[in-house]
């Protein structure tokens, strides 16, 4: 499979997620609206590029005529090092898949993230662990989240007050990260729902 660009990966992920949630692919207009394209024609061009790369098939004559061809591997995707400016679940970040039942976690896990560092040591999240993550932006203060600040991904406990976000470590050797939402790019990538001790599954 040819590597996808960041934008192509976003379009592919949107089609896949829409299929999983509704049972049907999105229209070009829905893709354009969700991803901020100026017109459905822009969405069509990205779909044609995906078709040329062999990951989807465009069925002519139907507004929702999109069929996925890229086989989804079994298990939860394991995300390793994340490149700057790219979606967390971009294909190039996936190191492999682990046959873990997502329903073991509440809410269910969507992916695994390899933990880097000991900033969350005191609650049992250690360097090299595989953190089970539920993909959502619906999180509350006090929860452990996966967050992206500018182009850096981190795992911390969330505390939000107005335009200021405090990302709190669980290790006294580390300082909190303070984010001013008026000045920095900040995105919640998901909610931590469990830990797999690295080595138990590899």
Curated annotation (Swiss-Prot):
Reactions performed catalytically: Hydrolysis of Ala-|-Gly bond in repressor LexA
Site (Cleavage): 84-85
Family: Belongs to the peptidase S24 family.
HAMAP family: LexA (MF_00015)
Main function: Represses a number of genes involved in the response to DNA damage (SOS response), including recA and lexA. Binds to the 16 bp palindromic sequence 5'-CTGTATATATATACAG-3'. In the presence of single-stranded DNA, RecA interacts with LexA causing an autocatalytic cleavage which disrupts the DNA-binding part of LexA, leading to derepression of the SOS regulon and eventually DNA repair.
EC number: 3.4.21.88
Organism: Yersinia pestis
NCBIfam families membership: lexA (TIGR00498)
Catalytic residue positions: 119, 156
An annotated GO cellular component: protein-DNA complex
Quaternary structure note: Homodimer.
DNA-binding region(s), chain positions: 28-48
GO annotation terms (biological process): DNA repair; DNA replication; negative regulation of DNA-templated transcription; proteolysis; SOS response
Name by which UniProt lists this protein: LexA repressor
Residue ranges the record marks as coiled coil: none
Keyword terms, alphabetized: Autocatalytic cleavage, DNA damage, DNA repair, DNA replication, DNA-binding, Hydrolase, Repressor, SOS response, Transcription, Transcription regulation
GO molecular function, one term: DNA-binding transcription repressor activity
TM annotation in the entry: none
Family matches, as InterPro entries: LexA, LexA-like, LexA/Signal_pep-like_sf, LexA_DNA-bd_dom, LexA_repressor, Peptidase_S24_LexA, Peptidase_S24_S26A/B/C, WH-like_DNA-bd_sf
């Amino acid at each position: 499979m040819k590597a996808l660009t960041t934008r192509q990966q976003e379009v592919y992920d949107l089609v896949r997620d829409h299929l999983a949630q509704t049972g049907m692919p999105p229209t070009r207009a829905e893709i354009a609206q969700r991803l901020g394209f100026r017109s459905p024609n822009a969405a069509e061009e990205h779909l044609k590029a995906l078709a040329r790369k062999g990951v989807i098939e465009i069925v002519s004559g139907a507004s929702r005529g999109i069929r996925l061809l890229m086989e989804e591997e079994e298990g939860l995707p394991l995300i390793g090092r994340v490149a700057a400016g790219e979606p967390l679940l971009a294909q190039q970040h996936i190191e492999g898949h682990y046959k873990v039942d997502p329903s073991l976690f509440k809410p269910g896990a969507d992916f695994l993230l390899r933990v880097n560092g000991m900033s969350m040591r005191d609650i049992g999240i250690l360097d090299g662990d595989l953190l089970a993550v539920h993909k959502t932006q619906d999180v509350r203060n006090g929860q452990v989240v996966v967050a992206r600040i500018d182009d850096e991904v981190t795992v911390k406990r969330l505390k939000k007050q107005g335009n200021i976000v405090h990302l709190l470590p669980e290790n006294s050797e580390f300082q909190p990260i303070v984010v001013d939402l008026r000045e920095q790019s900040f995105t919640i990538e998901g909610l931590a729902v469990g830990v797999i001790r690295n080595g138990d599954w590899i």
